[in-house]
């Protein structure tokens, strides 16, 4: 009888573990660039909505970006919304699993390009946000795609792409062997 009970306990534990693994693999990886902190209230509303859904999405970056003009660093505005989310996080955790901790969210808030438009892209214009994008995409242990949501300016994403294009492996051949 003990063997039968152990067997059923083992099967139950294994199925629960398997479901948890599948659920985690089904979560999409997301990095958001946002110009939150301007005069548009929908940016704050969108960030709140995203955080409320963060138990079903792996948020891997919250990046302050510039849109039309060079603005001061607005990561403090993102931090403000995250801290307010932290106040309700214990109640959310009572009703659903999978929410990131407040410390996890704090760690992924980064500043994007300080200059607006394509003036913020090129040699020597890396930012903590563009570096975060590259490091998240380069994670070897996680092969899921990374979704980039541009809620504001896209030049931080452009800088990450620029750097990868200009610093990764390049091929130069000194002769035209093998029909290259």
What are these regions (language model features)?
Residues 4-12:
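Sec-dependent N-terminal signal peptides
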Residues 123-167:
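Internal, conserved structured core segments that host functional sites
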Residues 45-53, 161:
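Histidine-anchored nucleotide/phosphate-binding helix
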Residues 18-20:
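Boundary at the C-terminal end of the N-terminal hydrophobic targeting segment
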Residues 172-180:
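Single conserved hydrophobic/aromatic residue that forms the stacking wall/gate
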Residues 29-33, 60-64, 147-150:
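Structural recognition of the beta-strand scaffold that forms the well-ordered cores
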Residues 26, 51-140:
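Glycine-rich nucleotide/cofactor/substrate-binding loop typically near the N-terminus or early
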């Amino acid at each position: 009888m003990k063997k039968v009970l152990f067997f059923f306990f083992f099967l139950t534990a294994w199925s629960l573990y398997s479901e948890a693994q599948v659920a985690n693999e089904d979560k999409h990886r997301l990095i958001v660039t946002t110009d939150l902190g301007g005069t548009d209230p929908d940016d704050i509303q969108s960030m709140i909505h995203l955080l409320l859904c963060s138990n079903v999405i792996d948020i891997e970056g919250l990046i302050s970006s510039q849109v039309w003009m060079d603005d001061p660093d607005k990561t403090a505005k993102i931090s403000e919304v995250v801290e307010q989310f932290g106040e309700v996080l214990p109640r959310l955790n009572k009703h659903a699993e999978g929410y990131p901790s407040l410390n996890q969210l704090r760690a992924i808030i980064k500043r994007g390009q300080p200059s607006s438009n394509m003036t913020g892209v090129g040699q020597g214009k890396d930012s903590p946000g563009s570096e975060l994008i590259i490091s998240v995409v380069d994670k070897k242990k996680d092969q899921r795609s990374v979704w980039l949501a541009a809620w504001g300016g896209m030049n931080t994403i452009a800088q990450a792409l620029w750097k990868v294009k200009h610093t990764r492996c390049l091929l130069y051949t000194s002769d035209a062997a093998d029909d290259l």
